[in-house]
Structure formats: structure tokens, C-alpha cells
Amino acid sequence: MLQVSVLRNNTEDVKKRLAVKHFAQPELVDTIIALDDERKRLQAEFDTTQARVNAASKEIGKMMAQGNKEGAESIKADVGNWKTTLEPLKEEMAKVEKDLQDAIVILPNLPSAQVPEGRTPEDNVVVREGGIKPVLSEGAVPHWDLITQYDLVDFETGAKITGRGFPLYKGKGAKLQRALVQYFLDYNTEAGYTEYIPPFMVNEASAFATGQLPDKEGQMYHATADNFYLIPTAEVPVTNIYRDTIVKQEELPIKMTAYSPCFRREAGSFGKDVRGLNRVHQFEKVEIIQITEPEKSYDVLDEMVKHVEKLLLTLELPYRILRLCGGDMGFTSALTYDFEVFSAAQERWLEVSSVSNFESYQTHRMKCRYKDADGKMQFAHSLNGSSLALPRIVACLLENNQVADGINLPEVLHRYFGSAKI
């Protein structure tokens, strides 16, 4: 969440940076400043009136002690009049404060100076590519055909149990999921990340703290009876471990990893985008999260990008890294790198990870702070990334490694899967 002081002291710069994200309501910045002015005015009026009441009450006490009842009574009338204005002032202050908070949470995070201009995914900048695109033999098929051929996922039964977009993994398909999750977690923990198994539902405060609410209200599954939300990513519960927390500077950086199922409504998707495992409502993902000092957060971002890149190299998958343009960035992000893997049978790039620096946007919302060397309270910076999201990784592993008598698996998965081939 942006701070009013930032908007007030850097108004034009804030508007320019919001324009990079193509934010449609730049006038909201002026509205927020005006609401803050009104809040301060009302607070000053309330404090002045309350001070008069307090001072007069003391004076009444003195007069009564001196036997000056008549003088005390005359002041009581003034006190009564002042007190009658306090309650309406409180109510007006509460309304203005609510209007201020409702307005400020609509503002997205400000983009870093490194964010390229642009509106659509076509404007994202390819930073680098790696791996070798496979040359498939004639007759190679997309993963949705391979899934049927090798009986790995049952979409029809999943749809019967729940609905479309809820796949039922079975046999070697389920085993491959488990192997990937275990490998990803081992890879992350060996790099110093502490593993967590978080709750897969969160309350409203947690969803607000990481920026899912109110921005993604309609994209999340909401259990209204208890006002809980199914998580769209492990980022939400794991980052909230440090909500309302003051950490010691020597504990930073805090490195966390977690596996979770993820639930997303994904309304509006159609066509090739939703074939097979390309886009589903429930999927598995392993996440990495770091909390660190502000001056180190962009070095940490580079470290996390390299971490995910090396993981993809071990899977022997062709990939590319993109720096997202302003129009394609997430609401909470200051800078995001996307990883895409080449799907040889579909002849297209599929996103498998996003790695983002949120700077202090999330930590202001969740009140995650630390004391610096001078004993001054500072807001930490938070970062997260997918390491990795499974469905499209599975799709590309199946497609890119298909041979006449099965599907070859990368060497790093052999001991986890128990075999070199499906």
C-alpha cells in the first residue's frame, strides 16, 4: 500500500509512474491528498475542542474546591456545548478515514524505473533465452493427446467430481506431480529456503495484506459462510506469517518455500489457452518468498531469478526470461520477470514462473517491520516467485521429450520418479 506522504511529496512523479502501469484513475492521487487534508483538519479541530474540555474541567474542579459554585456552573455550560460537538466530529473523522483508506487501496504499487513501457504481453522485453528447443519427430502430438495415450490425467472424471478445470491425476501422472514437487522443494531448501506447509485457506486480512483484496476479489474462490478464501498461491499464507511482526535485522533475509494447491477462477479464458493443462482452476505450485532490507531487495530479486533459471536448466527445458512492461504487470509488483518454457508440440511459449519485487507495498499493508542498526523502525521489502508452477512444466516435459516408445524424463527426476521414462 502506498503512503500518503509519498503521494503528497512526489505527486507528479507518482502520476507519471502510475501512467506506466496504465492506471485509469490518476485523479485519485489528488482525491487522496484532499481527504488526508480534511482528516488532518478534523483531527486538529477535535484535538483543540478536547483540549478546551479538559482545561475547563480542571478549572471547574479548582472552582468547586474554592467554593466558587457559581463560576463553576458558568463554565459547565461551555463544556457541555463543546462536548456536543465532539461526537459529530468523531463520526465525520471516521467517515473521512474510511473514504481515505478505500481510495488508497485502489492504487497499485509504483513500477520500478526498470519497467519498460507497454500495454500488452507483446510489449514485454526478452532479457535472455536458454536451453535448446527440441526437434520433434513427425507425428508428435500435444500434451493433451499424450495424457490420454498414457492415461496420466482424467479430465472427465475431474469435471464430474467438481467441474471443468479440475484435473484428476492418476497413476504415473500423479507420480510425476509428486516427483516434481519433491524435487522443487529439495532444490529450494538446499538453497537456504525454509520449508512450510501453510493453510490452503486464508482470512480476509491475509488476502488484503498481500494485495489480493480488493484487486482480485472476483478471481478468488470465496467460502462466504466463514469468509475464507481458497489461496491462489502459497505467497498469500506464507508471506502473512510475518504480518503484524517486527523482525530483527540480523534475521534478514528471511527465505521461505512452500508447496500448495492453487485455486483460481480464471474467468474469460478460451480456445487453445485452456486445452489440457494450459489453464486450469486447481493446480500445484512450489513458491519461494523472501523478506529483506530495502537496499538489498533488487540484489535479492536477481538472486531469485538466477535460482529459477538454474532450476529450469536442470529440467533441460528451453526457456526465456521476460521483463514485464507496465501494462502487463501485477497490481502489487514494482518489477516482475516472467519465465516461459517452449512447448514444442504446440509451438508456443508457456508461462511457468513469475518472480517479483513488491518493495514495501505488501509490508506496509501487513505491518512487517524491522529495527535498523540505528534502532529506527523500517518497513522491509518482500519478494516472491514460482519455483515452479507444475501444469505447464508437465505439459512441456511431456511434449518436448516424447519418443516412439514413451516419454523420456530429465535425469534429475529419475530418482524421484523411480524411472527414466513414462
PLM feature spans:
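N-terminal alpha-helical targeting/anchoring segments
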Residues: 1-134, 152, 156
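TRNA-recognition modules of translation machinery and tRNA-sensing kinases, especially anticodon-binding
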Residues: 26, 129-422
